[in-house]
Amino acid sequence: MTPEAALRVGAAFASRFALPAKAAVCASGEPISVVLKYAALAGIASQGVDAEAVNAASMSAFSYTVRKTGCAGGIYVNNNGRNAELVLFDENGIELSPDAMRSVRAGFLFGEQKPTLDAELGIIGNLNGLEEAYEQRLLCGIRRELMLNNKRTLRIGAPEQSGRVISRVLLRLGWNVERSYAENGLSPVFDENTIAVQIDNDGKISLSISGDTILGNSEVQTVIARSLAVNCGGGAFGLPEKEGGAELLVVPVSLPEPYRDDIKKQGVQLIYSKESLAEQRRLSFARNAYYPALYEPEAAVVKLCEMFVSGELKDYAEALPKVYTSEKSIRTAWKDIGRMLRMLAEGEKNGELVDGLRLKRDTGWVCVRPAGTADASFRIVAGSRDSEYAKELCDVYVEKLTRLRDSEKDKNS
């Protein structure tokens, strides 16, 4: 991403707004992200839209800023360790939908519409202090007395801005916070007063408690969702930001079947979303069931710390059913992906077409979805409470997809 490209993205993004309007821009804090931030600000102002520069903050804090300050949208410049990227938000602080992104992309290719008068330019200002407001919101959503009277240690590995938000919130409660820079993920925790958490660049969370108990992202989502379900309609982090969504929880379609059943036993209806956190946030807002602890990594970690103190986390982790998964991938031509997925769906019953195809099979389940990577076209993930059955189920669907791929080759030969 070059500054010129960032300027054009900012202009294309702002050209969609009805004037008068304002949009916010924030960077994750690295030097290159700051350069791109000011380029995007210039692009927004070039279209007559007022541009607000926000100090370095986490993506969740910036999303909260856009939502609470009347902005028509926002741009977050994120340096994920590989390449800088621009994440575009709507007026609700939710990542733009694919339809809106196509509109921005068309504007980017067309080029910015330059004004004829200086008076038509937007004003660039500063919008600060919202990160502190976001931290206060996290503090207001937990049982402070419980946290203050039961001080613990959090060992955390996370993107810089997310780690700072979480650290400041917990330090106010008297907790010890240790930053972890381990490249190989979590290590076991043998101190009963310590919890270790890892947040990756996609917002997925894993945690370690009490010896070799390590929970992956699906397990973390399940224990949080179960806690929300038990306290539905009240309690810390139990209420959605918009009233009326107390009976619904939006979870990824990849959530294993036993975990789904565990949550539904609490009397909550589950709505299934695509895998990405952005899609989960978008659907939860649309269904009026936005729970910060499920869709914001910072809120999730604070919630997990509260559950750790109350004993809920250990109880829920021990009660989780044991799940085994097996994963494989196959390659095929890009033009055949849609055809193969459609043919597979037509030959199966009771499939869920969300983010690919999900099927229930006896005591197991299988997800088949486009991989979206250069070295694989399809990703097949099978699961069961029996490890051998999970492997067998995965092999069965790899074979089915292979036959579909080869049958098309035979027709063309």
Protein language model features and the residues they cover:
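Gly/Ser/Thr-enriched, mixed-charge loops and adjacent short helices
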Residues: T2-A11, N83-N193, F237-P240
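Short glycine-rich phosphate-binding loop at a beta-alpha junction
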Residues: A21-G29, R152-A158, E247-V253
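Conserved active-site and cofactor/substrate-binding residues in soluble primary-metabolism enzymes
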Residues: E4-R8, P20, P31, V35, ...
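N-terminal small/polar loop signature for handling phosphorylated ligands or for N-terminal nucleophile
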Residues: R8-A11, S15, L19-L86, R168-T213
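Short, acidic/small-residue loops that bind anionic groups at enzyme active sites
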Residues: D90, I94-F110, I214-N231, I271-K274
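Phosphate-binding and adjacent anionic-ligand microenvironments
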Residues: N201-D202, G211, T222-S413
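Predominant activation on well-ordered alpha-helical scaffold segments within soluble catalytic domains
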Residues: L7-A14, L41, A45, S63, ...
